[in-house]
Amino acid sequence: MARIASVNIPDNKRLVVSLTYIYGLGTTMAKTICKKAKILEDKKVKDLTDQELISLRNIIENEYKVEGDLRREVTLNIKKKKDIRSYQGLRHIRKLPVRGQNTHSNARTRKGKAVAIAGKKKAVK
């Protein structure tokens, strides 16, 4: 397995697909990285030479924020919004959807498991 940005990427997959295993790289960005490195997108990772792997590593590490750096930046941005008490920060604090989604009937993944309301006991006739 090749190791890029401290992530083991699978050998038996195409380069574009295996680059998406890195947090912060999608298919579009993986294709642009392949073009910059002048490597065919359809090439399997196991067929890459050491020089090609080194060029991929250099491009990813020097030009893009991936993995730990990106995760850290995202969490700091969320923390900053919470600290300045912006609307989005308040939604994060309350664990509600941040970007204007409806919460009346949806948002179960964000709000957590539904808590049943204890109903009144029916009187026995």
From Swiss-Prot:
PROSITE patterns, sorted: RIBOSOMAL_S13_1, RIBOSOMAL_S13_2
Pfam families tied to this protein: Ribosomal_S13
Any one GO cellular component localisation term in the record: small ribosomal subunit
Keywords of this entry: Ribonucleoprotein, Ribosomal protein, RNA-binding, rRNA-binding, tRNA-binding
Molecular-function annotations in GO: rRNA binding; structural constituent of ribosome; tRNA binding
Domain of life (superkingdom): Bacteria
InterPro entries attached to this UniProt entry: Rbsml_uS13_C, Ribosomal_uS13, Ribosomal_uS13-like_H2TH, Ribosomal_uS13_bac-type, Ribosomal_uS13_CS
GO BP, sorted A to Z: translation
Function: Located at the top of the head of the 30S subunit, it contacts several helices of the 16S rRNA. In the 70S ribosome it contacts the 23S rRNA (bridge B1a) and protein L5 of the 50S subunit (bridge B1b), connecting the 2 subunits; these bridges are implicated in subunit movement. Contacts the tRNAs in the A and P-sites.
Family designation: Belongs to the universal ribosomal protein uS13 family.
Quaternary organization: Part of the 30S ribosomal subunit. Forms a loose heterodimer with protein S19. Forms two bridges to the 50S subunit in the 70S ribosome.
Entry-linked NCBIfam families: uS13_bact
Protein name: Small ribosomal subunit protein uS13
Protein species of origin: Rickettsia bellii (strain OSU 85-389)
Organism phylogeny: Bacteria, Pseudomonadati, Pseudomonadota, Alphaproteobacteria, Rickettsiales
